[in-house]
Each structure stands twice: as C-alpha cells, then as structure tokens.
Amino acid sequence: MELIVGPRLFSTWSLRPWLVLRRAGAVFDTREVWYRSEAEKAELRRLSPSGFVPLLKVEGETIWDTLSISEWAAERYPEAHLWPVDPTARALARSATAEMHSGFHALRDLCGMGPDHPMAGDARSPAPSDPGLDRDLARLVVLWSQMRERFGAGGPWLFGDWSIADAFFTPV
C-alpha cells in the first residue's frame, strides 16, 4: 500500500489521510511528489485520476481525495474506531469533517500550514479585518466548543476519543 502525498511541510490535504492511516495501524509507504514544474504536474496527472494529491494505491486500485481515503480506512480497520461509536457523535463528526473538507476557504487560503511555504510571510499575513477569515475563525470556535462540550468528556479530542475529524482539523 502506498500513500502519495504532496510536500509534507505544506500539504494539509496530504497530512490528513497520513494521520488517519497511521492511527488505523495501516502499514504503508509514503511517496512525496511535488507539482511545481510542468513535468511534475504531468507526472501527478498520470498518477492521480483528479490530478491532485493525496491518493492511496492499494490492491491494484487508486483511491483519491482525503475524505475517500479516510472513509476507506474506517471501513478497512473497524477496530481502530476512526469514527465515534455513538451514532449522533458519529454523524456530527462526519458533518464537521465534511465542513472542513469543503469549507473554511479564507482560513485555508490565508493561513498556510508551513512557515516556509512560498505563500507565507509578512506580505501574505492575513489582515485582522479580513471578513472571510473572521467568519471562518468564529465558526471554528463555535464548532469546536460545541463538539467538545457535547462529546469531549471521554478524552482530549473533539469527540472525546480521537477520530477522523481530528485529523481534518489537525493542520488548523
């Protein structure tokens, strides 16, 4: 099994399934690919149906996208309890994960993961008055507070025990 990821210092999308697979106890190799040059982009398009990372090569199949890889791991390694056991907590963990996967655009655009990222630095620092970032941060505080208040008694993570939701919010 091979997880193909983007640059480890910069790719939050790649970090998420790597964390999930590690937490599941999966044995896998990791290959880091870059996509700066046209040749690198062409190689990535050859490897990935979507042309993006991450992707998981397993049993002759290619699974792409952070959420798909994470769901595959939850089904493949049920003993790892990658989603909360409680049905309500599980549904809300999936909702929070999907929201991070598809939302928080200003946060992801303006607040990169790595300090050495080409888009980081004083010139790219978000202005405190950025309305999109303000909305994203306010939503993040509400979301985390609600999940911890409702489900956090069992441990230090968003839903008490570690879950895929924690992997998706780790880069934040």
Language model segments and positions:
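GST-like domain detector, emphasizing the conserved glutathione-binding G-site
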Residues: 1-127
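GST-like fold's C-terminal all-alpha helical module
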Residues: 100, 104-172
